[in-house]
A protein has these predicted regions:
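Intrinsically disordered, glycine/charged-rich C-terminal tails and inter-domain linkers
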Residues: 1-42, 192-193, 199-310
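Generic detector of leucine side chains in alpha-helical contexts
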Residues: 17, 38, 42, 46-48, ...
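Catalytic NTP-binding/metal-coordinating core of nucleotidyl cyclase/transferase enzymes
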Residues: 20-133
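Functionally constrained cores in energy, signaling, and assembly domains
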Residues: 29, 33, 54-58, 109, ...
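Residue-identity detector for glycine
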Residues: 47-49, 58, 68, 114-117, ...
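Catalytic beta-strand-to-alpha-helix segment of the class III nucleotidyl cyclase homology domain
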Residues: 122-255
């Protein structure tokens, strides 16, 4: 079972500094101090080895600054509305996988950037499913099925995606860590509206489902046997259905196509991280909650096939 995000206590660190350091020191002779005792105490408190890995999904509205000032003022509302709708879809469409999440928890683990943001999940599969449902909502908005008059005012919206998997921690109700840093770096380097993932995400899918190409053939039973879901309740498997991973393998709905290609590297500290371009085609059956007689099957692409490097 995934551990909680580690929280760093400001007061604990301050007390250690009061014990092993001085806030200000002015001496006639400058001396480089021995920091070994302070380092040892800080390492015990921070517990770097116990900082859990989390998956971060980065969403960025492409060329937000190119919209008019009036439209720019409306886009944060639109993004928030699409995000809330996506949260509801994920909880409804994937009762087994998202059983440990509520809308409040997902919103709490969201870092807003104004024209997008970062969502923190336990596994890359959570991030991928959220991105897929988001792409569905974005498509019905762009196709004038979701607030069509607002769509006419603002215009079409494009989003670029990034998924990373690394350490994340919490300090003063803010989130930090390499997963967030690398995600922001990937998004800033992409100008082609793709869905990019790092090598840690790629490795997670390779270990757990024998590669991302198998997303189009695995079942919800296969998902339930992934190690990260071993402590999940199996009750949702009996009482509900997953809208992407069926009980039997099918390419009529859910993920009907998946392509993955390595496109380059980014620098992270002293190491290089391989970056992959992911392209999925996802088909979902949607029902209008305001009028359940209205139904529609929507197929979208998450990412694209542009293989230009990063």
């Amino acid at each position: 079972m995934k551990s909680k995000i580690k929280s760093i206590d400001h007061e604990v660190i301050r007390e250690i500094l009061q014990k092993h350091d001085k806030r200000v020191i002015f001496e006639k002779t400058n001396v480089v101090p021995d920091e070994s005792e302070l380092r040892e105490e800080l390492e015990k408190v921070l517990g770097l080895g116990h900082v859990s890995q989390k998956s971060v999904l980065g969403l960025d509205i492409y060329q937000y600054s190119s919209y008019g000032e009036f439209e720019q003022m409306l886009i944060p509302f639109l993004f928030k509305t699409i995000l809330n709708t996506t949260i509801d879809l994920c909880i409804d469409n994937h009762p087994f996988i998202f059983q440990n999440y509520s809308r409040e928890q997902i919103e709490k683990n969201f870092i807003s950037t104004g024209d997008g943001g970062f969502l923190i999940f336990d596994t890359p599969l959570h991030s991928l499913l959220f991105a897929s449902n988001y792409a569905i909502v974005l498509r019905i908005y762009n196709a004038f099925h979701f607030f069509p008059r607002l769509r006419k005012i603002i215009g079409g919206i494009s989003t670029r995606y990034a998924i990373t998997y690394d350490k994340v921690y919490n300090y003063h109700d803010n989130f930090y860590g390499r997963a967030i840093i690398n995600n922001a770096r990937i998004l800033s380097r992409d100008s082609l509206n793709r869905c990019l993932i790092d090598e840690h995400v790629h490795r997670w899918f390779t270990v757990n489902i024998d590669g991302m190409e198998n997303l189009q053939v695995i079942t919800i039973d296969d998902v339930s046997h992934i190690q990260d879901f071993s402590n999940y309740s199996t009750l949702p498997l009996a009482t509900g259905s997953d809208k992407i991973f069926g009980r039997e393998s099918s390419r009529r709905e859910g993920i009907i196509n998946s392509d993955i290609l390595k496109i380059g590297k980014i620098k992270a500290k002293e190491t290089d991280i391989n970056i992959y371009n992911l392209h999925l085609q996802v088909s979902l059956s949607l029902v209008n909650n305001d009028d359940e007689s209205q139904k529609k099957i929507v197929t979208v692409s998450l990412g694209n096939l542009n293989t230009t490097g990063i």
